[in-house]
Swiss-Prot record:
Pathway where this protein functions: Amino-acid biosynthesis; L-histidine biosynthesis; L-histidine from 5-phospho-alpha-D-ribose 1-diphosphate: step 2/9
Enzyme class, first EC level, given as a word: hydrolase
The protein's Enzyme Commission number: 3.6.1.31
The protein's name in its UniProt record: Phosphoribosyl-ATP pyrophosphatase
Nucleus as UniProt keyword: no
Gene: hisE
Catalysed transformations (reactions): 1-(5-phospho-beta-D-ribosyl)-ATP + H2O = 1-(5-phospho-beta-D-ribosyl)-5'-AMP + diphosphate + H(+)
Subcellular location: Cytoplasm
Lineage: Bacteria, Pseudomonadati, Pseudomonadota, Betaproteobacteria, Rhodocyclales
UniProt source species: Aromatoleum aromaticum (strain DSM 19018 / LMG 30748 / EbN1) (Azoarcus sp. (strain EbN1))
Length: 108
């Protein structure tokens, strides 16, 4: 069972870091650099996750997915979104075929 509360605690810390001095906090420095820097970090962690998976290195897969989730939470917080927004979307999709879910999306 996932301890969802740990994600909420991390998200709360990330929200606090938005107000912190960028010189004193890695996360604050990412926020200060803006969306492009945060997206670059998410992409980097996604690539590292893929490399660990291709190497079949399960310990590193867990480490890299943790980094990916962390930086995804940074991105969510940057845009004023929350863990609950993502969980709500998971709930909406639960029990729906991936093919059907994709067809239901509106094109913008």
């Amino acid at each position: 069972m996932i301890d969802i509360e740990v994600l909420h605690r991390v998200a709360a810390t990330l929200a606090e870091r938005k107000k912190a001095d960028p010189d004193s906090s890695y996360v604050s420095s990412l926020y200060a650099k803006g969306t492009d820097a945060i997206c670059k970090k998410v992409a980097e962690e996604a690539a590292e996750t893929i490399m660990a998976a291709k190497d079949k290195d399960m310990l590193h897969v867990v480490w890299e997915v943790t980094d990916l989730w962390f930086h995804s939470l940074v991105l969510l917080t940057h845009f004023g979104l929350s863990v609950d927004d993502v969980l709500a979307e998971f709930r909406r999709r639960e029990g729906v075929s991936g093919i059907d879910e994709k067809k239901s999306r509106t094109v913008s």
